[in-house]
Amino acid sequence: MDLEKEVRALYLNNRRIKNGFQFTVPSPGTYPYQWLWDSCFHAIVLSHFDPESAKKELLSLLSRQLPDGMVPHVIFWKQGLIRPYEWGWGKDDIGSITQPPMLAYAAWEIHRRAPDGAFLEKIYPQLLAYY
């Protein structure tokens, strides 16, 4: 068994590209959306063998950041499935809550494995707004 090969295959199978953004779904059948915590952990794992995809994972999360800095806990990239947060929230493509902050840690872990000051400079204002 080649664990690294299997992990790479799993991540490739669970990779999605929507509206120009790349992300990883935790489980295509059960959880077909992008989740904040999951994506942060996916990015950390990806940083070991595909740092560019790790960066794209975080950039896709930050693409749906609200003006007040909140990053939603779920992004419904694929419409028409389950949208339990639509009522009372007024947005049909994101969740109405967030999750504990993992974004900066994920960004730092990516940077530790594949130093990229330009990437950190690009996302720093959004991270600051989130925290």
Name these PLM-found stretches.
Residues 1-34, 52-56, 60, 69-71:
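Low-complexity, Ser/Thr/Pro/Gly-enriched N-terminal "stalk/linker" regions
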Residues 21-40, 47-48, 83-100:
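Solvent-exposed loop and edge beta-strand segments that line ligand/cofactor-binding
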Residues 39, 43-46, 107, 127:
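Hydrophobic core/packing positions within alpha-helical solenoid repeats
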Residues 51-114, 118-121, 128-131:
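Helix-terminus loop motifs that line ligand-binding clefts
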